[in-house]
Amino acid sequence: MAKVLVLYYSAYGHIETMANAVAEGAREAGATVDIKRVPELVPPDVAKASYYKLDQAAPVATIDDLANYDAIIVGTGTRFGRMASQMANFLDQAGGLWAKGALNGKVGGAFTSTATQHGGQETTLFSIITNLLHFGMVVVGLNYGFQGQMTLGEITGGAPYGATTLTGGDGARQPSANELAGARYQGKTIAETAIKLHG
């Protein structure tokens, strides 16, 4: 049975919610799924003053965890059109795994959130996907079998490069039903691909 890691960073909880939906989809495909987060780098007093969601249930991942999975699905909110520094810092520490080829052939994917419709969703996904390709991973996006990303009837995230959500400038908007459906679809598709490749 394929093992899937949903690895995320979430400052305000939106990506945490998306990560849970991604995991639901992967489990639906029959994979064993773990959800882990990367360490917070912001000092605790600053994080509290900024109303960061610090009470997240997922355990903190270690770099060595990455080698133990057949698929790794990475999610983080955007920071000025790229992945958050917390996720970048974590992935930057994977050089030893990269040097050994320990991630070659694993299945990867990306998901993200932005405050606005044009706040850098695709560039943030690309910043994650670039890392996955350098690691030697097979990247799976959110294909157009998910019709929800074609809708014009509502403001919604979703791109062929990965599932996305919009939060609003004040963070009040939570992932919509359509966005969560996209996250589940991507999780299921990635898990199905991992099962085909790794059993």
Swiss-Prot record:
InterPro entries: Flavodoxin/NO_synth (IPR008254), Flavoprotein-like_sf (IPR029039), Flavoprotein_WrbA-like (IPR010089), FMN_Rdtase-like_dom (IPR005025), NQO (IPR037513). Its cofactor is FMN. Coiled coil: none annotated. Its EC number is 1.6.5.2. It is an enzyme of class 1 (oxidoreductase). NAD(+) binds at Y12. One of its GO terms (molecular function) is NAD binding. Binds 1 FMN per monomer. Residues 4-190 form the Flavodoxin-like domain. Keywords: Flavoprotein, FMN, NAD, NADP, Nucleotide-binding, Oxidoreductase. One of its GO terms (cellular component) is membrane. FMN binds at residues 10-15, 78-80, 113-119, 134. Substrate binds at W98. Disulfide bonds: none annotated. It catalyses: a quinone + NADH + H(+) = a quinol + NAD(+); a quinone + NADPH + H(+) = a quinol + NADP(+). Belongs to the WrbA family. This is NAD(P)H dehydrogenase (quinone). It comes from Rhodopseudomonas palustris (strain HaA2).
